[in-house]
Amino acid sequence: MERSWYWRVALVVAVAILSIYQLVPSWFYFKLPPDQRNTEAYDTSVPGWAPDAKHHLNLGLDLQGGILLSMGVDVDRAVKTKVARRADEIGEFLKGKNVAFTGTKVVGGGAQVEVSAANPGEVKDAVLGSTGYSEEMYSPGGAPDGAVRFAFKDSVLRDFREKAVKQAEKVIRNRVDKWGVTEPDIKTKANNQIQVQLPGFKDPEKAKELLGRTAQLEFKIADDENPVLDQVRTQLPQCQGDRQGLSLPLPESGCWTVEPVELPSGGSRAATMVAANTRTELEKVITEKLNPLLDPQKNVVGIGEGQVGQGPIKTTYYRTYLLRAKTELTGDYIADAAVAIDQSDTLQRGRPVVSFKMSPEGARLMDKLTSENMRRRMATVLDDKVETAPYIQGRISSNGQITLGSGRNQQDMFDEANGIALVLKAGALPAPVTITEERTVGATLGPELVRKGTLAALVGLALVVVFMVVYYRGTGLVADVALALNGLLVLAVMSMIGTTLTLPGIAGFVLTLGMAVDANVLINERIREEMRAGRNVRQSVQLGYDRVFWTIVDSHVTTLVAGVVLFQYGSGPIRGFAVTLIIGLVASMFTSIVVTRVIMEYFTRHDTARLSV
């Protein structure tokens, strides 16, 4: 035998062994009952020497069921956020141009920016004289004396809305990918809707928590010197309590109390804060009592949690923080986030925290922010909740951490920290999303139909195997061996790349098996023709493969092009069919041209060999 034959044998054996190895997780996955396949029971059942447990064959929504969520993106909120950032940018732009102004604010329902200045004309000329701003906005007039307004063009607002939906879809896709759900179907629908299908996932509450969470991380400076909230003492009752904390439950109307806060200039003061039993109660107090006292361009009220109690048994209440309105820094600058254990010498020591790392630009901005606000409290606000508000004791640049509320067991805190780290890494949604539809979907086909379909496929495959042996005898048996390896190889590749097997995917799989059989039929018929022409067995096999090679390649490549087009322009089930088809075609060429030839050359290695064909 030639040396090249031994190399080809080694290749075939290696491919077969690797395919079996790759399918080990799938073997353990399908051995378990359906309700245990996506749990720790599966993770612990896979041997340590096997591939990663996540590399197993997955069944699609039509075969195993799952969760379907439809989410609406609040594009108007996204526009307001974008306009508010533009207002801050215009302020920085005017400072850079040394143009005098007294302030910027968002007006006109969140779609216009108003700049107050002694000379509004100078502000208008500076802003609209800049190419970047003149392409986006114009001055509609209607501003009060001593101010000028800038409105965004309709095309720009439309672009803001479209980008908000696209960014939301991208963020949701990133979260699902980091979550480990394989082959989700995520697509944008009409009316700013995004539909998400999660095959095999059975926990709708966890899905809503991770996908629906906005994950807007903001850093704001506390305005502890401002006594404006002291006025609420005449409108609300005082909270009752002692040195151990507040006496719960609190009045339904909310109540006020004081907390000592350090001042940047030295010393301290008793700052007023408002507390309530629930977030809903506190939000009502803020809307009715506190917001009328504030200038919304200067201050906002943040909501955080407090705990009362000793040891592991604690009761949560909700409290206010008076913050500056301006968001100094956002989570857009976070490069990475992970769960860690607090090592500080505080009550948080040993508890899970979310550590994060800023991007280079974020590190520069954080360093500037902390250096300018020494001895002030900096609130970390995640989705409108103040997670922590420590004092800035030194300059912070690239690394930071978010502490979590106490009063819960360690596992709950780990789960929350994992969820926060995941959404921070995947990015924040550009605007809040609301769940408009939620369904736990059962398998479309049902267990009985799946069983019957599987039985039909196996019976059909068995008939093909028997036919090949009866009609082609020895060479038919070789073709059957190649067919088995073909199926093994296709399933192994699908499990390795995380492809989900759907009903259309099964159709693609069966089609490629049929093409593999067809290729072997062409080879066997060609070998017969060469033997009828008087050539010996060895020559017939060699010429048979050589002369049918391009016919097989041509048919497979033509179908492969069609599969690529379907994958590129199709979606959902069509892409599933295309992926399986492409993998199967490549495997079919390998088994038909390489595997069967290696076996045939072994049995016909002598000129006097006989062949049953």
Swiss-Prot record:
- Which InterPro entries would you find in this protein's record? Acrflvin-R, SecD, SecD/SecF_arch_bac, SecD_1st, SecD_SecF_C, SecD_SecF_C_bact, SecDF_P1_head
The cross-references to Pfam families, in alphabetical order and at most eight, read: SecD_1st, SecD_SecF_C, SecDF_P1_head
Bilayer-crossing residues are: 10-30, 452-472, 477-497, 503-523, 548-568, 576-596
- SUPFAM superfamilies, alphabetized: Multidrug efflux transporter AcrB transmembrane domain
Fetch the Gene3D superfamilies from UniProt: 3.30.1360.200, 3.30.70.3220, Multidrug efflux transporter AcrB transmembrane domain
Q: Which GO terms describe its cellular component?
A: plasma membrane
Q: Principal localization?
A: membrane
Instruction: Tell me a GO biological process for this protein.
Output: intracellular protein transmembrane transport
Per the record, the domain of life is Bacteria
Alphabetical UniProt keywords: Cell inner membrane, Cell membrane, Membrane, Protein transport, Translocation, Transmembrane, Transmembrane helix, Transport
Give its localization.
Answer: Cell inner membrane
Its placement in the membrane is given as:
Multi-pass membrane protein
Give any GO molecular function from the UniProt entry. protein-transporting ATPase activity
The entry describes its oligomerization and partners as: Forms a complex with SecF. Part of the essential Sec protein translocation apparatus which comprises SecA, SecYEG and auxiliary proteins SecDF-YajC and YidC.
Known role? Part of the Sec protein translocase complex. Interacts with the SecYEG preprotein conducting channel. SecDF uses the proton motive force (PMF) to complete protein translocation after the ATP-dependent function of SecA.
Q: Into which family does the record put it? A: Belongs to the SecD/SecF family. SecD subfamily.
- What protein does this entry describe? Protein translocase subunit SecD
Instruction: Name the species this protein comes from.
Output: Anaeromyxobacter dehalogenans (strain 2CP-C)
